Structure formats: structure tokens, C-alpha cells
């Protein structure tokens, strides 16, 4: 897979519903909250794991909010 395969429209179905996207956002936020809670209570080695996953999900949440038109998200990559 090339880095710019997103330009290949045959790879995308564009069939996701708003409900599916909202559900994914809800799941991502719940998972992010779980990692945040565990990060607060964990020993250092485990805290790093939860911190890394929390930060990764931060990007997922921001991108999904942008897709849904959140007025507070100007651009998902900033």
C-alpha cells in the first residue's frame, strides 16, 4: 500500500452512516477515559502504556469530531 492510497477512490466505500461515526466517537471517548483513569493509578511502566494510548485516542476523537462538524475543531491535524 502506497502512502497516498487515500486518493484511490476504489479503496473507499463511503458507506459509513452518521450513527456509525457517532458510535465510534462514543467508543473512542470511553476508551480514552478508561486509559486516563488507569494512567492515574498505575505504576510507571503501566502508566506509559496508558499515556501513549490516551494520546493516540486524542487524535482519533479530534478527527471524528471534525468529521461530525464540531465547531470547536478547525482542523484535525492541528
Could you describe each region identified by the protein language model?
Residues 2-29:
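Short, charge/polar-rich alpha-helical segments
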Residues 34-78:
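Short, charge-rich amphipathic interface segments used for partner binding and complex assembly
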Amino acid at each position: 500500500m502506497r502512502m497516498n492510497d487515500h486518493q484511490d477512490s476504489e479503496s473507499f466505500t463511503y458507506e459509513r452512516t452518521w450513527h456509525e461515526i457517532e458510535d465510534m466517537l462514543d467508543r473512542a471517548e470511553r476508551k480514552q477515559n478508561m486509559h486516563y483513569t488507569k494512567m492515574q493509578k498505575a505504576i510507571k511502566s503501566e502508566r506509559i502504556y496508558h499515556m501513549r494510548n490516551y494520546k493516540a485516542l486524542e487524535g482519533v476523537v479530534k478527527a471524528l469530531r471534525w468529521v461530525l462538524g464540531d465547531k470547536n475543531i478547525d482542523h484535525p491535524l492541528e
